A protein has these predicted regions:
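Loop-rich catalytic cores of soluble enzymes, especially ATP-dependent carboxylate-amine ligases
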Residues: 137-285, 289
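Flexible, glycine- and charge-enriched loops at secondary-structure boundaries
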Residues: 1, 107, 111, 190
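A very general structural signal that marks isolated residues within well-ordered alpha-helical segments
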Residues: 4, 10, 50, 185-187, ...
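Terminal catalytic/cofactor-binding subdomain
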Residues: 14-166, 174
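Single conserved hydrophobic/aromatic residue that forms the stacking wall/gate
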Residues: 1-12, 286-291
Length: 291
């Protein structure tokens, strides 16, 4: 009985320690007022002139031509992205091309960098009879027919979402989005912005809606992407439980994160699938390091 009690106590202490480390990670993200910045990520579909999706191999060749091998990043010889001084390029599950512009002081700076990226890509795309399209969902292909790029993490995500709900394939293979990152001053500022973002989310989704078809079928309802996300994984999508209450904090958010299924985790540098286990349940793999 003492051994079991001691073991349970050790697990409880370790869980508390890990939650505090996640809390410390959030706190380490606080920025001084003079140093606050904004970042943006924009995902694109790479489409050929016959309106078919460019293949992973074609997009990899395109990026190597544009950025050169020295700026490209690989996983087991497969190109996964590129990095410059101003932004990073990555490939999403079905080869959607994402630019992540490093945080800047103003929206105008982000706009200038993005326009520079488009101009840099323009001639290379033209030579290959390709173009970039920015819309919320794959405009021509069916998601289930699009293969995953050779990235281990996406294999684990794909397998996991097949067992949660019905829209994981559409989310991973068929969708694209624009994401914005905004700095916060302190915990109070974080909570205010987090809650406001969740309240504005459906409004912004409606205002920026640009999805005309889903898997070849014309869309008849508004915000179809939201409908997709509503049926991906209820444990990790939607409004964070308790986040709109007055008690919401770094710590309560850390508790939520700690108990959401991981899907995968790193073990000595190797990405391992964890299925539906959360960090709290997978203590053999998860010992969170200091931020």
């Amino acid at each position: 009985t003492r051994v079991r009690s001691s073991a349970a106590s050790d697990v409880y202490k370790r869980q508390g320690m890990n939650i505090r480390k996640i809390t410390d990670y959030f706190r380490a993200g606080c920025k001084e007022d003079y140093n606050r910045r904004i970042g943006v990520e924009i995902e694109h579909f790479v489409i050929k002139e016959d309106n078919t999706n460019a293949t992973y191999e074609e997009i990899a060749e395109l990026l190597e031509a544009v950025f050169g091998n020295e700026q490209c990043e690989y996983e087991q010889r497969s190109l996964l992205g590129c990095v410059t001084m101003e932004y990073a390029i990555s490939l999403e599950p079905a080869a959607q091309l994402e630019i992540s512009i490093f945080p800047r002081k103003t929206v105008q700076e982000l706009e200038q960098i993005y326009e520079g990226f488009l101009k840099r890509m323009e001639s290379y795309l033209g030579l290959r009879h390709m173009r970039l399209e920015t819309c919320g969902y794959q405009p021509y292909a069916k998601a289930a027919e699009l293969p995953l790029i050779p990235k281990r993490r996406y294999e684990y995500m794909d397998a996991y979402f097949k067992h949660t709900e019905t829209m994981g394939i559409r989310m991973m293979r068929g969708s694209a989005s624009t994401q914005v990152s905004i700095d916060y001053l302190n915990e109070q500022d974080f909570v205010k912005k987090f809650q406001l973002a969740q309240m504005l989310s459906p409004v912004l989704a409606l205002l920026t809606e640009n999805t005309a078809v889903i898997d070849g079928i014309p869309v008849k309802k508004h915000i179809p992407r939201t409908e997709i996300w509503n049926h991906v994984d209820k444990k990790r999508c939607g409004i964070v439980p308790g986040s709109m209450s007055e008690e919401f904090s770094f710590y309560t958010y850390a508790e939520y994160v700690y108990h959401v299924p991981l899907i995968f985790a790193r073990d000595h540098g190797i990405i391992m699938p964890t299925g539906e286990w959360s960090a709290a349940e997978h203590l053999s793999l998860i010992h969170i390091s200091e931020p």
